[in-house]
Design a protein with these regions (language model features):
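The feature captures the alpha-helical scaffold/lid subdomain characteristic of nucleotidyltransferase
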Residues: 34, 43-60, 64-186
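Short amphipathic alpha-helical segments and helix-helix/interface helices
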Residues: 2-3, 154
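Conserved catalytic core of two-metal-ion nucleotidyltransferases
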Residues: 3-46
Length: 186
């Protein structure tokens, strides 16, 4: 997506963000949608979510597995992001491929190679299970389904064989920072 195109349809590029992340992220303001956040090839916040070879999986969006990874990678996760995960858990199908479902195998393989991402992601699955109990808008069946899906996703993650890199990093645990702290949010 080019800056010229976005400007031609009424958006202004946030130059500060572009100066800091020029090749990976652009933020545009204006137009009918007040803000558009564009990630190029990867999202690199607390943990990297790489879209290389994955943008072709869905004609309208990043894959559902990548959407889940985008949320699970946030160490200081907030209410809105937990609700996004809970919504995904109530409406999406889960399986071992990307055909209109969350590819849990892909998520598990991604976590199996990165202890830090695994730790953040599995911690956030626990946070979802805790958070959903306080969401008054959900009925008991919906809450139970969300908890069940969180448990099933976690079980699949746990089942995936871990790499030597994961095993080596796991020995240090949370005593050493395991997530990126040098990212900038708008």
């Amino acid at each position: 997506m080019s800056v010229k195109f976005m400007e031609s349809v009424g958006y202004e590029c946030d130059l500060q963000t572009m100066a800091m992340t020029g090749t990976t992220r652009h933020i545009y303001f204006g137009g009918k949608v007040p803000m558009i956040d564009v990630f190029i090839d990867k999202l690199d916040y607390c943990h990297e979510v790489n879209y290389d070879g994955r943008l072709e999986l869905d004609p309208w969006s990043v894959s559902l597995a990548d959407i889940l990874l985008q949320k699970l990678q946030i160490w200081e996760i907030n209410h809105k992001d937990l609700v996004d995960i809970e919504y995904l858990f109530t409406v999406a199908d889960f399986g071992e491929d990307d055909a209109k479902k969350v590819n849990v195998g892909y998520v598990a393989r991604r976590f199996a190679d990165d202890w830090g991402f695994w730790y953040t992601g599995t911690t956030n699955l626990d946070r979802v299970k805790e958070h959903v109990g306080g969401v008054d808008a959900l009925n008991d069946d919906q809450k139970a389904k969300i908890k069940q899906v969180a448990d099933e996703v976690r079980a699949r993650i746990d089942q995936e064989p871990k790499t030597k890199k994961w095993e080596k990093r796991s020995k240090k645990g949370a005593k050493k920072i395991w997530y990126n702290t040098g990212f900038s949010d708008w």
